[in-house]
């Protein structure tokens, strides 16, 4: 274990694993991580990455005097459908929605591989102050690569993409998976990029900061989704493999912690510094991070409050093979979790007469 006073690490160190005694084998595929001598799961690529992030965070707080950036907890709306609603559907013989939701999580996790392709301009070209010995300085020296491998796997080693598929197949006894699930996700992701908020910084710089802020928001919002999945898949009344399926989700949740922390750290380091426009003028890093993160949060809340409930009900209506789907939906709705967004996001609340239940 490296001394926490260290601030500079090689790519190989950031990607290094802690020793394990037993591999994690999922559906015949060796996945990342493993089990130590006491049988405890150990997340991959954490031998140096975790203490490095801790050291960078401590340095940031000591030198800037400011707290780490975070996504406000009050913006994370309850999961929809909630645990009770999903269990009701499964006990009613309506399995296809859960098959689809778990498949969507797996597919989106696999998209995490794309983070390694994110262009990072030379830091000195847009940050006035020194960035040596920071998380920022290690984005292309292991942090993005570790994140990509965690989510999508690496060479023959499975990652979260494969682990979510396995959890779904174990809990729901190898359901048929429609290829339409993937194509629908691709279609939704095909929307163009938002208009720039800070064109004076140049597109590559804004894209980098926007991407990190959006991924952090996704990771924070997803934490409640993963807890939701673990609670459902661990219930023997609705899960065909409650121990195996829930354990896989538990391992994934442990793996996600370094993603949240390194992104918080890098964004905090930007906040504490002065950014430079294309013509060399200073811009507050705090304002850039806050404004880009705020837009991302608003987009996610709009989707969860307005778009997701409609998609959920449409999916149930299309796939529920029951005599009276309207009666099913009435019972489903009665189990929902009402939620009112914080006052600063009141304009995003569903319109009068729309579903009051929030979504993923």
Give residue spans per PLM region.
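Non-heme di-metal
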Residues: 1-360
